[in-house]
Amino acid sequence: MKTPVLKKKIIKIFQKYDLSKDHALISANALINAELVGAYGHGLSRLKMYCDRISKKIINPKPKIKTKKISQSISHIDANNSIGFVAADLGIKTAIKHAQKNGIGMVAVKNSGHYGLSGYYAEQAVKKNLIAMIYTNAPPAVAPHGALKSLFGTNPVCFGTPTGSKIPFILDTSISVINRGKIRVAARNNQKIPEGVALDKFGKPTVDAKKALEGVQLPIAGFRGSGLAWMVDILSGVLTGGNHAGRVKDPFDDFSGPQNIGHLFITFKANLFQKNYNQRIKDNIKTIKKLPKIKGVKEIMYPGQNKFNRYKQNLKKEISISDIIKKDLEALINN
């Protein structure tokens, strides 16, 4: 399906579920971006879930979002259980304004929901020649190191910086071996997941995606990944006023109340300390790319390069939609 046609359909669906035109557009743009960069677990596979949560009055389609200015560079946003895309859009835009005016910006958000890809928001800051660091927590999926029960979310860590070229450096990675969205997509399509990704509910390694969803995901690098997940839970949950310590509800399975996810957006001018930052980052990347390569490796890529190239390629083509997603779209449009 052509991107403009698909975007119109998504906007129409969100407006049907009482989102304003502006909020529907913000949400559609984020979903389309996820599809174009190949992050399908954060794309159209979640559209029905958002609509279900709106119809059950868990996501507030008409939120009264409040922004409290703590200082010239710091704000705290209460998203009033809005769809996560809208809360995150306001969060990053506010952080960008603070940084452009004062050199640095920090925005905490509470009472939000799943907002898609952190890198999508980091890229908005990078385009303004800002460095961005973004944290958000998620429903329990990963067991803390030494524990038998999942408590941490896949809690992504995101860092973005200008590179002096058109392709930004965007590191957007969950602290689990793979993100939960990929496992959900695999489960829905009856596909297997790689080994070493998850344990079933009995604590045994599994490649069955459905059993993985019933069990726990494994963190990257053992106790180090567990520590990173804990850090993100503190920064995005404890600090912001959002849910934390396993209290974020699963958006697909738990309709007992709002998620109250927290986000933290930190932005600052790339040339804050070194006026020639862009030249220095170019030198940094050039030096690393010149290193001897392993056999079969054509180019040493920096984080974000592959997704940028994939986005450009996919933008020229139609977005491929599975039969399951097509049924979701038809049902949501005709409901």
Question: Residue spans of the language-model regions?
Answer:
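Acidic, glycine/proline-rich low-complexity segments that act as flexible tails and inter-domain linkers
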Residues: M1, K12-S27, I32, Y40-I58, ...
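Generic N-terminal amphipathic, Lys/Arg-enriched alpha-helix
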Residues: M1-Y17, L264-I266, N309-Q313
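Active-site cofactor/substrate anionic-group-binding motifs, chiefly glycine-
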Residues: G43-A99
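A generic, well-ordered mixed alpha/beta core segment in the N-terminal half of proteins
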Residues: S75-G164
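Phosphate/diphosphate-binding glycine-rich loops and adjacent basic-rich segments that engage nucleotide
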Residues: V142-K210
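Small-residue-enriched flexible segments
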Residues: R180-G241, P258
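Catalytic-core signal marking the mid-to-C-terminal active-site face
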Residues: L239, H244-N335
